[in-house]
Amino acid sequence: RQELLKLEHAFGEYLAHEVETNESYAEKCKTFYQAIERDGKKSGDDYYSSTSVLSFNYTDLIEQFFDGGEDGAFVNIHGKLGGEIIFGIDGKDCMDNPNAVSFTKTFRLMRRGGSRTDKLIRTANSSNLQDATDVIKFYGHSLGKADYSYFQSIFDGVDLYESKTVLVFYYPYDDVDESKNEEWRNGLSNSINDLLVDYGSTLDNKDHGKNLMHKLLLEGRLILRGVQID
């Protein structure tokens, strides 16, 4: 465990140096975040909206200009520079393994005191599924198994199968090289498929689990979209 702590400390120092020496990083973060946050966002005097961010990044520059509204929240779930940062494995199949549990992100988050994540999503209500979060946007995450437990909790919270929650997955768009866009779309599509297949297998109704992605597509609730990063 001491070796893991040393690695986290060394990585924190490296990342802090990279952020400090990259003069354009802050402005790029702001521009890029605002492009994604505003994409497809409804507005109007009679429409209330709030935004929450679950960041798997260890930097907090976006939080400096984040405005999520009264019900919004910004959470660096694995810590951030200047404090304790967390590396670890997913706890889904490890919480009963005494040799592995202390290396899971779940255990290490608990040991750190946890994070206030109650405002990240609006959960679905069985009597009114429209209460659930309208849109969940993803960018820059591999969607790999290391963070699967977070996605499962979010999808359960919004009752993904029955609600109207839309999933939007973004990839870096190149307006010159279409082959790069195709490569990004293919890779992202495979990752989304793996994520939704894994999640579908946890649903009580196994038929619902098998056709989850098909249902999302038919209802216009599964979207891939390119976004320019320059």
Protein language model regions, located:
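Generic recognition of flexible, low-complexity loop/linker segments
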Residues: G40-S43, F65, L120-N128, F155-G157
